[in-house]
């Protein structure tokens, strides 16, 4: 299990635990269940790269945007 921290820059920091072999889509589904927003409306970013099929590691901090 890995833990990822998602910050939406509006004061919400969400810690999500997922398996290391889960995809970004699985991460979005778990995240949407925790914050109550549809998974299709979530965009995960770090700096200027948007995460679609990238590899994430334990303890990564991602920026959370709503489309």
Curated annotation (Swiss-Prot):
Transferase recorded as keyword: no
Alphabetical GO biological process terms: mRNA splicing, via spliceosome; protein modification process
GO MF term (any one): protein tag activity
GO CC aspect terms: cytoplasm; nucleus
Coarse class of the protein's main subcellular location: cytoplasm
Subcellular location field: Cytoplasm
Domain Ubiquitin-like residues, every copy: 2-67
Sorted UniProt keywords: Cytoplasm, Ubl conjugation pathway
The keyword Cytoplasm is assigned to this record: yes
Protein name as it appears in the record: Ubiquitin-like protein 5
Organism of this sequence: Dictyostelium discoideum (Social amoeba)
